[in-house]
Amino acid sequence: MIAVIQRVNRSYVEVDGKVVGEIGKGLNILLGVVKGDTEEDIDKLIKKIPFLRIFEDENGKMNLSVIDIKGEALVISQFTLAGSVKKGRRPSFDNAEEPERAKELYQRFVERLSEYIPVKTGVFAAHMKVFIENDGPVTFIIDSKAL
């Protein structure tokens, strides 16, 4: 499971011209589910993401978590994170999990994260427009297999 997390001042997502999820200060999370991902991958990400100290304290140091600042998260499914560009010029998505299983794991990730912070989402498998006011910018790529 691959998560791209971005520290944001604001983020929202539109589907068919309508805002379906919107947050203020917090994390924009793009989540890619890879073949073979399990509940264990979710556990690893959940033990890390809400506790990462990537928000500035009163001294300007990255010392606070999204929980500490009472922030929220916007979680967007993004199967292209499982893509490979090793061969040729067209990305391969062979490593992306099957849609049904990916949706199940995505929803479970959202449920688990919402135990710690308020969570909004996009629409799974929809064509979305994601608007991000990145703060910093501060962006991290977290692969559950590397944790």
UniProtKB/Swiss-Prot annotation:
GO terms for cellular component: cytoplasm. CDD domains: Dtyr_deacylase. Its EC number is 3.1.1.96. Transmembrane segments: none annotated. One of its GO terms (biological process) is D-amino acid catabolic process. It catalyses: glycyl-tRNA(Ala) + H2O = tRNA(Ala) + glycine + H(+); a D-aminoacyl-tRNA + H2O = a tRNA + a D-alpha-amino acid + H(+). Keywords: Cytoplasm, Hydrolase, RNA-binding, tRNA-binding. The keyword RNA-binding applies. The keyword Ion transport does not apply. It is found in: Cytoplasm. One of its GO terms (molecular function) is Gly-tRNA(Ala) deacylase activity. Gene3D superfamilies: D-tyrosyl-tRNA(Tyr) deacylase. A motif (Gly-cisPro motif, important for rejection of L-amino acids) lies at residues 136-137. It is an enzyme of class 3 (hydrolase). It holds the Pfam family Tyr_Deacylase. An aminoacyl-tRNA editing enzyme that deacylates mischarged D-aminoacyl-tRNAs. Also deacylates mischarged glycyl-tRNA(Ala), protecting cells against glycine mischarging by AlaRS. Acts via tRNA-based rather than protein-based catalysis; rejects L-amino acids rather than detecting D-amino acids in the active site. By recycling D-aminoacyl-tRNA to D-amino acids and free tRNA molecules, this enzyme counteracts the toxicity associated with the formation of D-aminoacyl-tRNA entities in vivo and helps enforce protein L-homochirality. Belongs to the DTD family. A Gly-cisPro motif from one monomer fits into the active site of the other monomer to allow specific chiral rejection of L-amino acids. Homodimer. NCBIfam families: D-aminoacyl-tRNA deacylase. This is D-aminoacyl-tRNA deacylase. It comes from Persephonella marina (strain DSM 14350 / EX-H1). The lineage of its organism: Bacteria, Pseudomonadati, Aquificota, Aquificia, Aquificales. The gene is dtd.
